[in-house]
Amino acid sequence: MPENPSSSPTEPPEQSAAFEKWRSGLAQFTGLGLSESEKAERERLKAQGKLAKDWDKCEGWKRDLMNYSPMITFLLNHLKLAGCPFPSSAMQCHPCPENRAGGFSPDHGILLCQDRFFNKKHMEDTLAHELVHAFDHCRFKVDWGNLRHHACSEIRAANLSGDCRFTREVKRGFYAFNKQHQACVKRRAILSVLANPACTSPEMAERAVNEVWESCFTDTRPFDEIY
């Protein structure tokens, strides 16, 4: 009499391996059934993938803006004319904290916060803002530890870059129609000066901005007028 077949036959090795690959892939996709170490590795790989994706997008937008944005190409050209050519390598894409989109350092160039841009237009405004700082540093030898110097460059950058256009202000929750642009420029300049290590109070930041307001708000170099 023939033997009864086993109630739990052993799968062929290749079928078992295929099932395990499918199970592992599903677990990685859903996060279900993973050990704590596997979950940690999954999150690490996801974060790594997002960093790479954000960096690729930031670099692509940067390349497009450097080639096709009238605002950015204008500023880059005037930096070159002023004796301070600004290559692509001086504009670095990196992840940042939530409260910033970019930055300028005389020693390191421009920081573009790859994970903080709503869209390419936001990045264009940010890059223009930082390039105005770069232009000021090149042309006017700004002492960034001097609050009046810093305030002047922040006024000019906020005024000229598009950072204070009406649509940007609406997104921030500011809806004033009367002198909205001036109010935005002053507010954002004060906030930036307040972050200067040499500034010890909001009153000091506001005073520095007010002291240079008239001359710096009307100074549109290298533009003929507000863009």
Curated annotation (Swiss-Prot):
Keyword check for RNA-binding: no
Function: Has a dual role in the assembly of mitochondrial ATPase. Acts as a protease that removes N-terminal residues of mitochondrial ATPase CF(0) subunit 6 at the intermembrane space side. Also involved in the correct assembly of the membrane-embedded ATPase CF(0) particle, probably mediating association of subunit 6 with the subunit 9 ring.
Protein topology in the membrane: Peripheral membrane protein
PROSITE patterns membership: ZINC_PROTEASE
GO BP annotations, alphabetical order: mitochondrial protein processing; mitochondrial proton-transporting ATP synthase complex assembly
GO CC annotation terms, alphabetical: mitochondrial inner membrane
Enzyme type, top EC level: hydrolase
Pfam family, one: Peptidase_M76
Annotated a divalent metal cation binding sites: H129, H133
Subcellular location: Mitochondrion inner membrane
Protein name: Mitochondrial inner membrane protease ATP23
Organism name: Cryptococcus neoformans var. neoformans serotype D (strain B-3501A) (Filobasidiella neoformans)
Top-level taxonomy: Eukaryota, Fungi, Dikarya, Basidiomycota, Agaricomycotina
List of catalytic residues: E130
GO molecular-function term, one example from the UniProt record: metalloendopeptidase activity
Family according to the record: Belongs to the peptidase M76 family.
